[in-house]
C-alpha cells in the first residue's frame, strides 16, 4: 500500500475539485511575473466579456486591476476588508468618458455561475520578501480567494496546526500580497479537514461535515469529501463569499468570521421557508431553528438578516429582532449595530420603549433592523403595521415569546382577561412572518413559529469542538459511623425524639 503523502493529498483535492467543474492548472505553466498573485488575463477576460454591452475599454479594465493591486499589503486586515467588500457587494466604476454612464462592477457574477472562471492552481511560485509555493490556490475570475495548505497524516511530527502556522506566519510574513484577496483558508491532512479565516486563531478553524445540510455529519476521510462537495460546489462557494463572511464595521481585533456549515444551512433553509410561509399567501410561520447552546445562533441570525435585506423578493424588509432578556438584547444590539455595512442598512437601532417602537415602525414602508425585548409588547400597543414584508426573529423562542393564550385574573375591580406578550406582538404586526431560534424546542414553540427547519444538536456541537462535553459520574459517598452511636440515634427516635433520652444514654450534642 502506497503512503498518503502531501503530494498525493494535493492531487486528491485537485481531483475532487475537478468533480465540481473547477479546472486545474499547474502554476509552472502560467505566464506571469513571479510577484503577481492575480491571474490578470483571467480577470481581464471576465470583465471584458461581462461588461461588453457597456462598451468597457481595455484601459478601464487595466484601471480596475491597477486599483486592486495598489491596495497596500502592509495594512493587511484593512485592505482585505476593503477588497472583500468590493468582491461581495460590487462597486460603482466611473467611466473615462464623462458622457458614458457609470458601471456597477461585480468581480464575481453571482446570478449566472457559468460566467465565472473557477481554477485550482498548484505549484505556483510567488516571490515577495521570500519565495513561497502554496500547496493550492483557488481562483475565481483571476482572484486568489482560497488558499490550501496540506500536511501528511502519516508524518507524526506534522499536523494541520503546522499548516495553519505555515499560512498565518511564514506566508503572511513573506507573501502578504496573496492574502489581500483571501476569502478563507483550508488546512488538511486528509483525515482532519478544516476551513477558517486567515485572521482567526487556530481553534476557530472548523470542519464542513455536510454536503447539502440534510445528511448525518461525517468525520475522517469522509469529511474531506463533504468539505469539497459541500463548501466548493460552485453555487455554494460563491454564495459563501457573497453572503457568509462577516467583518465588523469596527473592531479592536482583526475579526473575520467565516460561516460554519450549520450556520450556512440554517440561514439558507430558514430564508427559503420564510418565502414559502410569508403572508398573505402563507401562514406567517417562518420556521424554528434548534441549535445547541453556544453554537453561534447570533451569527446565524446575522447571516439570515443579510439574506433577507439583500433579497429582491422581500423588497427591503423590516427586521425585528426580539429577545426576552435585557442582557441578550444588549448583546445582539452590540453585534448588529456593528454590522451595518454587512447587512446593508444603516437603520439598525435598539428600541428603548413602547413609544419608541411605535414611532419607528408606524408608517415605515421598508428597511430597518430594530432590536427589542418581548416585554415591550403589552396590551396598550395598537396596530403598528399591516405590511407583509416584516420579519420577526425571536431568540430563546421557547420562553415568554410563545404565550398566546388568554389568562383570567381576579382583581379588586373584578375579573380581568389578559394575554401573554406574544399575543400582543402578533396583534401589533398581524401580517409579519415569525421565526424562532431556540436551544429547547417545545410543542408551543412549533405552534407559534412552525416546524423545525434545521437543527444542530449537542452531539454535533461537541464533535465540532464548539461545546465542551461535560460528563456526570455518579458516586456513592463513603460514610463511616460508629455502631454505638448508631444505636444511640435509634434509641433517640424510639423515644419520640426526646432530648432527655439522649442525656440518659450519654450522647453529647
Task: Outline where the language-model segments fall.
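ATP-dependent helicase/translocase motor core
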Residues: 2-318, 323, 327-343, 365, ...
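Short glycine-/polar-rich loops that comprise or flank the Walker A/P-loop
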Residues: 143-145, 179-183, 315-317, 388-389, ...
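Residues immediately C-terminal
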Residues: 155, 328, 376, 399-402, ...
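Structural recognition of the conserved hydrophobic beta-strand(s) that form the central parallel beta-sheet
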Residues: 186-188, 370-372, 392-393, 433-438
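Interdomain helical connector at the RecA1-RecA2 junction of SF1/SF2 helicase-like NTPases
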Residues: 217-218, 446-509
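Conserved helicase motor
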Residues: 326, 348-358, 373-379
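Conserved motor-coupling elements within RecA-like helicase/translocase cores
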Residues: 351-370, 383-387
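SF2 helicase catalytic motif II
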Residues: 385-433
Amino acid at each position: 500500500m502506497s503512503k498518503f503523502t502531501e503530494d498525493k493529498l494535493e492531487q486528491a483535492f485537485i481531483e475532487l475539485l475537478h468533480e465540481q467543474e473547477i479546472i486545474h492548472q499547474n502554476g509552472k505553466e502560467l505566464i506571469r511575473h513571479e510577484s503577481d498573485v492575480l491571474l490578470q488575463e483571467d480577470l481581464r477576460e471576465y470583465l471584458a466579456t461581462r461588461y461588453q454591452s457597456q462598451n468597457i475599454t481595455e484601459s478601464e479594465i487595466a484601471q480596475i486591476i491597477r486599483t486592486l493591486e495598489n491596495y497596500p499589503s502592509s495594512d493587511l486586515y484593512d485592505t482585505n476588508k476593503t477588497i472583500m467588500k468590493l468582491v461581495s457587494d460590487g462597486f460603482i466604476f466611473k467611466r473615462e468618458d464623462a458622457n458614458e454612464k457609470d458601471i456597477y462592477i461585480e468581480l464575481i457574477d453571482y446570478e449566472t455561475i457559468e460566467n465565472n472562471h473557477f481554477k485550482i492552481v498548484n505549484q505556483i511560485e510567488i516571490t515577495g520578501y521570500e519565495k513561497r509555493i502554496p500547496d493550492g490556490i483557488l481562483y475565481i475570475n483571476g482572484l486568489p480567494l482560497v488558499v490550501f495548505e496540506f500536511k501528511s497524516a502519516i508524518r507524526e511530527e506534522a499536523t494541520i496546526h503546522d499548516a495553519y502556522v505555515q499560512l498565518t506566519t511564514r506566508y503572511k510574513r513573506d507573501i502578504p500580497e496573496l492574502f489581500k484577496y483571501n476569502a478563507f483558508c483550508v488546512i488538511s491532512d486528509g483525515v482532519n479537514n478544516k476551513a477558517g479565516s486567515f485572521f482567526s486563531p487556530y481553534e476557530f478553524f472548523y470542519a464542513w461535515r455536510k454536503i447539502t445540510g440534510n445528511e448525518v455529519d461525517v468525520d475522517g476521510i469522509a469529511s474531506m469529501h463533504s468539505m469539497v462537495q459541500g463548501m466548493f460546489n460552485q453555487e455554494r462557494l460563491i454564495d459563501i463569499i457573497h453572503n457568509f463572511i462577516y467583518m465588523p464595521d469596527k473592531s479592536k481585533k482583526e475579526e473575520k468570521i467565516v460561516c460554519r456549515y450549520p450556520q450556512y444551512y440554517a440561514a439558507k433553509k430558514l430564508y427559503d421557508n420564510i418565502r414559502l410561509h410569508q403572508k398573505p399567501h402563507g401562514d406567517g410561520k417562518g420556521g424554528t431553528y434548534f441549535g445547541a447552546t453556544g453554537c453561534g445562533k447570533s451569527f446565524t441570525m446575522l447571516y439570515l438578516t443579510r439574506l433577507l435585506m439583500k433579497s429582491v423578493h422581500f423588497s427591503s424588509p423590516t427586521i425585528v429582532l426580539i429577545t426576552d432578556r435585557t442582557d441578550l438584547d444588549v448583546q445582539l444590539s452590540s453585534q448588529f449595530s456593528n454590522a451595518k455595512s454587512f447587512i446593508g442598512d444603516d437603520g439598525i437601532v435598539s428600541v428603548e420603549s413602547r413609544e419608541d417602537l411605535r414611532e419607528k415602525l408606524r408608517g415605515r414602508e421598508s428597511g430597518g433592523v430594530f432590536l427589542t425585548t418581548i416585554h415591550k409588547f403589552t396590551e396598550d400597543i395598537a396596530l403598528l403595521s399591516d405590511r407583509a414584508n416584516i420579519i420577526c426573529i425571536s431568540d430563546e423562542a421557547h420562553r415568554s415569546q410563545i404565550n398566546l393564550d388568554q389568562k383570567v385574573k381576579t382583581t379588586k375591580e373584578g375579573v380581568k382577561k389578559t394575554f401573554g406578550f406574544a399575543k400582543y406582538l402578533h396583534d401589533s404586526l398581524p401580517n409579519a412572518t415569525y421565526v424562532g431560534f431556540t436551544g429547547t424546542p417545545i410543542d408551543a414553540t412549533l405552534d407559534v413559529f412552525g416546524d423545525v427547519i434545521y437543527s444542530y444538536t449537542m452531539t454535533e456541537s461537541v464533535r465540532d469542538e464548539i461545546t465542551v462535553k461535560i460528563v456526570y459520574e455518579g458516586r456513592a459517598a463513603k460514610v463511616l459511623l460508629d455502631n454505638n452511636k448508631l444505636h444511640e440515634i435509634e434509641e433517640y427516635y424510639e423515644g419520640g425524639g426526646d432530648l432527655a433520652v439522649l442525656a440518659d444514654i450519654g450522647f453529647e450534642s
